[in-house]
Amino acid sequence: MTNWNYQQTNFVTSAPDIRHLPPDTGIEVAFAGRSNAGKSSALNTLTNQRSLARTSKTPGRTQLINLFEVAEGKRLVDLPGYGYAEVPEEVKLKWQKALGEYLEKRQCLKGLVVLMDIRHPLKDLDQQMIHWAVASEIPVLVLLTKSDKLASGARKAQLKMVREAALAFNGDVQIETFSSLKKQGVDVLRQKLDSWYNGLEPAVEAEE
């Protein structure tokens, strides 16, 4: 199995919708989550690049579909954050349309990483995203981000609760904790991405 070097990931393009994306070939893994769930921080931690994906304390800064190339034909996709964002309704609807089109029509999408703040997991939109992926037979890795915000006992309890709740999705849904600050969960994320890029069977969940 090839272990991809995520530190060599480079920015390719930003697109307002799928019509402006590169050809629908190769393998793409998309990162999705509510605004301020820590998507950009996770991408920067994964690639060990401080500013590959722009981070912001203002929710909703990721307004475009941002593509990054890990290796030829292997791409990471930073999708527009969903949920809360201080933007006009018209703009929000445009993001949602772009997000929906990408998820429904992009044939090279082979894995979905859904990021949720460990303190506020499984909001309605998060569950919709996972239900959609399961219905489309796309495997999901849920990262419970900002896990450093909780003490060890509370963190383990949240992980157990979300894993039990995720059984209801009846799909290939793996749940792990993640902290960009402490670099916790990065190896599990890399292993999962490696398996998707190599077209392998799902792995067993890691222990906390």
Curated annotation (Swiss-Prot):
The keyword Metal-binding applies. This is Probable GTP-binding protein EngB. GTP binds at residues 33-40, 60-64, 78-81, 145-148, 178-180. The gene is engB. GO terms for molecular function: GTP binding; metal ion binding. PANTHER family: ENGB-TYPE G DOMAIN-CONTAINING PROTEIN (PTHR11649:SF13), MSS1/TRME-RELATED GTP-BINDING PROTEIN (PTHR11649). NCBIfam families: GTPase_YsxC (TIGR03598). Belongs to the TRAFAC class TrmE-Era-EngA-EngB-Septin-like GTPase superfamily. EngB GTPase family. Signal peptide: none annotated. Mg(2+) binds at residues 40, 62. GO terms for cellular component: cytosol. The keyword Acetylation does not apply. InterPro entries: G_ENGB_dom, GTP-bd, GTP-bd_ribosome_bio_YsxC, P-loop_NTPase. Its cofactor is Mg(2+). One of its GO terms (biological process) is division septum assembly. It holds the Pfam family MMR_HSR1. Necessary for normal cell division and for the maintenance of normal septation. HAMAP family: GTPase_EngB.
